[in-house]
Amino acid sequence: MADLSVNIGDLKLCNPVMTASGTFGYGKEFEDFVDLEKIGGIIVKGTTLHHREGNPYPRMAETPMGMLNAVGLQNKGVDYFVEHIYPQIRDIHTNMIVNVSGSAVEDYVKTAEIINDLDHIPAIELNISCPNVKQGGMAFGVSACGCSEVVKAVRNVYKKTLIVKLSPNVTDITEIARAAEASGADSVSLINTLLGMAVDAEKRRPVLSTITGGMSGAAVKPIALRMVWQVAKAVNIPVIGLGGIMGWKDAVEFMLAGATAIQIGTANFIDPAITVKVSEGINDYLERHGYTSVKDIIGALEV
């Protein structure tokens, strides 16, 4: 068997396959379907400083080769997570990573400070696609300045591995990635969902209550792959690739394009055991091509 281990900052993953936030609950929900310890890292549901109800229904819609979601970061807040969720997941022997969201820089900072004290959470992933309510609702992640502001503030209080999740809804994602790196990020993950919309022609109304939502699934893969390739060339920190990964071949393509690790999202809804199948598929690919380590294929695309 090939060596599948990779490093993301101070984080060591047994293999490069992770779960994307919002598609795998808190991990425990899937333990009857898959051996959680065979997953490189589990990124749990998005967590905010305070309780959030989420958006009204309908907030999910099927699209050709994908889906739209507008769940709205529904969660019970970080204090609830610490008191009720953390005790249930601290015994899972893999990297448990918390996705952190906020509507103001102070929200991110306070949430990160609280999570920093949890021994069995070795990393956080900042979702900077959230709107900044103090700046007219523009998402932090659509400008280098907005990205720098929140990443620097969190870096000042968070002492473990810091991953920054980038929005694809920008003109030049490399500019945002470089800003994250310069502000102290240990890694960047991309892409978050693409802004999309669905219409019910018979009712002449939007399908989603919020009109627009985040698009994910196989249809977004070419865009995600292109952005991962661009960012991997632009920064010197590990890149985590996601967006439309439905099987092992997709994962290998992302790694050839420069991703050190990958995340699986929408595919978890189709096959709860897809993560382990993908890691096994990567191993088979390495052995067929004579590689002894997965590191040998990172950025090995010949152009």
From Swiss-Prot:
The keyword Cytoplasm applies. It catalyses: (S)-dihydroorotate + NAD(+) = orotate + NADH + H(+). GO terms for molecular function: dihydroorotate dehydrogenase (NAD+) activity. Keywords: Cytoplasm, Flavoprotein, FMN, NAD, Oxidoreductase, Pyrimidine biosynthesis. This is Dihydroorotate dehydrogenase B (NAD(+)), catalytic subunit. GO terms for biological process: 'de novo' pyrimidine nucleobase biosynthetic process; 'de novo' UMP biosynthetic process. The keyword Cytoplasm applies. The active site is at C130 (nucleophile). It is found in: Cytoplasm. Substrate binds at K45, N69, A70, V71, G72, L73, N127, N192, T193. Pathway: Pyrimidine metabolism; UMP biosynthesis via de novo pathway; orotate from (S)-dihydroorotate (NAD(+) route): step 1/1. Its EC number is 1.3.1.14. InterPro entries: Aldolase_TIM (IPR013785), DHO_dehydrogenase (IPR050074), DHOD_1B (IPR033888), Dihydroorotate_DH_1 (IPR024920), Dihydroorotate_DH_1_2 (IPR012135), Dihydroorotate_DH_cat (IPR005720), Dihydroorotate_DH_CS (IPR001295), Dihydroorotate_DH_I (IPR049622). It comes from the Bacteria. One of its GO terms (cellular component) is cytoplasm. Its cofactor is FMN. Catalyzes the conversion of dihydroorotate to orotate with NAD(+) as electron acceptor. Pfam families: DHO_dh. Heterotetramer of 2 PyrK and 2 PyrD type B subunits. It is an enzyme of class 1 (oxidoreductase). Binds 1 FMN per subunit. Belongs to the dihydroorotate dehydrogenase family. Type 1 subfamily. FMN binds at S21, K45, G46, N99, N127, K165, I191, G217, G243, G244, G265, T266.
